[in-house]
């Protein structure tokens, strides 16, 4: 391991973290600096093939345009989600949304768990592509929660289901290298990933309450949190191990919500007045359906189109992905916003004004998203080899602790790329080779990678910026990341311990 090379490859990440967390600068300020530094490295230190300036421009130019195009797609999703929130505010329906949720439970802590964890799990299975945080964060803000806390909670809620993604893509496609090599089946990859994340969802309700309310938030709520964690844990285990990756996330989210509502109605929760949402008694302007209509439409249309369109149209999924997977999700959210506006009786003039106001708030995000994505693509590129250098150096140092390192490598990949799928595809072959040389189980090692990649989404700057933009918190990324890093550290250690136990003690011969 060449320590200088490692530090130089790591330096773009350091620039982002130190700028946002250390100097408390906005991502809008830090991201262009990180991009400039990464470009300098690509043209000089990591010009591995000794290309001329013109040749390097030719290699990097497609990566720059790819970053801009993918950034536009993310901004489009942010625009759709933020427009819905602004419509609810403009019409006053936001108060009726609070009242509707309060009818399920007037305990704000229960609302945090259902909307912050269970809804994102469902949405990840229904669509993925950043939709969970983009929908859950504005929803929590609509319920009256602090915006930065809402963002952190929504990102945390999506920290486990991202291993399965829309219809299991992250595990199915991400683990294809193991399947193609005859080392694992899709079912085995899904089962082992579920055995990691079942413990993640077990502890997340407790972390969320501490994040939102501090220690006082646990008063009278521990029985419910235990039920929510255990029921979600068991549901995820059963679906991932005995049903399949395709339905694990959506099924876990839906069943957990139903079980949670049943618990609240049949058993009840002791709610101190300070945690009670009084919105249930206010004078309504809209019915529950009308007030919630944009979100109701999304909950119906996202899974309906994701699973229904490929089922009835030949090559339907390929058609959906013509402009990239995320684009169809963008369109559905935009359509749901329009349908919601019609349901709420919003006239065209008002809708246009809301869209204009929303656009002025989210368009500057393109600079941030584009810059960070270009940094990610350059670091992933074979022309620089920066990401592979980081991963291989970590692997070379840890030796028999490689299973734990695989979790960290997965997280670092998702931190840079913004997707668990990208991280899995990037490092799967490296884990296969490492497992062979160490005489370890490649399935459990890849599961650690897969689980870590899902968790890495929690602290990814791209995801944080996008989620901040949905609730008008651009510039407050440091406040959000301080919250998410604490949660990330707890679950990362848990997953690293599980990786060692699964590989070396409990399942050394799983699938072999």
Where are these regions (language model features)?
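Juxtamembrane and boundary regions of transmembrane helices in multi-pass small-molecule transporters
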Residues: 24, 163-277, 451-512
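Hydrophobic alpha-helical transmembrane segments of multi-pass integral membrane proteins
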Residues: 107-138, 142, 366-382, 397-430
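Alpha-helical transmembrane segments of multi-pass membrane proteins
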Residues: 109-121, 147-163, 184-205, 400-415, ...
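Re-entrant/interfacial helical elements at transmembrane boundaries that shape
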Residues: 131-141, 154-155, 168-180, 208, ...
């Amino acid at each position: 391991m060449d320590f200088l090379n490692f530090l130089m490859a790591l330096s773009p990440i350091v620039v982002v973290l130190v700028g946002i967390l250390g100097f408390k600068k906005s991502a809008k300020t830090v991201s262009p600096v990180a991009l400039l530094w990464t470009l300098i490295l690509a043209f000089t230190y990591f010009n591995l093939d000794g290309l001329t300036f013109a040749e390097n421009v030719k290699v990097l130019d497609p990566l720059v345009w790819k970053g801009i195009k993918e950034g536009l797609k993310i901004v489009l999703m942010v625009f759709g989600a933020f427009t819905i929130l602004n419509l609810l505010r403009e019409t006053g329906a936001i108060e009726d949304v609070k009242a509707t949720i309060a009818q399920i439970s007037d305990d704000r802590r229960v609302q945090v768990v259902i909307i912050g964890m269970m809804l994102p799990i469902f949405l990840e299975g229904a669509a993925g592509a950043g939709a969970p945080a983009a929908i859950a964060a504005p929803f929590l803000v609509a319920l009256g929660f602090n915006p930065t806390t809402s963002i952190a909670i929504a990102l945390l809620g999506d920290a486990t289901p991202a291993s399965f993604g829309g219809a299991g893509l992250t595990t199915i496609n991400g683990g294809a290298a193991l399947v193609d090599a005859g080392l694992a089946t899709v079912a085995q990859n899904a089962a082992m990933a579920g055995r990691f994340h079942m413990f993640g969802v077990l502890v997340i309700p407790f972390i969320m309450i501490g994040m939102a309310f501090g220690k006082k938030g646990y008063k009278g709520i521990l029985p419910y949190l235990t039920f929510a964690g255990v029921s979600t844990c068991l549901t995820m285990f059963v679906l991932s191990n005995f049903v399949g990756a395709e339905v694990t996330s959506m099924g876990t989210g839906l069943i957990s919500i139903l079980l949670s509502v049943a618990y609240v109605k049949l058993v009840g929760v002791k709610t101190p007045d300070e945690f009670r949402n009084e919105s249930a008694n206010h004078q309504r302007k809209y019915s529950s359906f009308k007030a919630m209509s944009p979100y109701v439409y999304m909950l119906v249309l996202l899974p309906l189109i994701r699973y229904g369109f490929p089922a009835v149209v030949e090559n339907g999924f390929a058609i959906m992905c013509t402009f990239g997977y995320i684009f169809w999700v963008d369109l559905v959210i935009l359509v749901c916003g329009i349908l919601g506006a019609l349901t709420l009786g919003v006239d065209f003039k008002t809708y246009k004004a809301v869209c204009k106001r929303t656009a002025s708030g989210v368009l500057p995000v393109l600079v941030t998203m584009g810059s960070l994505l270009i940094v990610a693509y350059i670091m992933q590129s074979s022309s620089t080899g920066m990401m592979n250098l980081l991963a291989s150096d970590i692997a070379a140092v840890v030796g028999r602790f490689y299973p734990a390192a695989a979790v960290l490598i997965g997280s670092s990949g998702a931190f840079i790329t913004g997707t668990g799928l990208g991280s899995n595809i990037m490092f799967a072959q490296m884990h296969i080779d490492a497992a062979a040389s160490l005489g370890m189980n490649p399935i459990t090692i890849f599961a650690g990678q897969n689980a870590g990649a899902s968790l890495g989404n929690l602290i990814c700057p791209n995801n944080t910026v996008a989620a901040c933009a949905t609730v008008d918190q651009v510039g407050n990324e440091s406040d959000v990341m301080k919250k998410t890093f604490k949660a990330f550290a707890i679950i990362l250690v848990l997953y690293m311990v599980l990786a060692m136990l699964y590989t070396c003690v409990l399942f050394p011969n799983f699938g072999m």
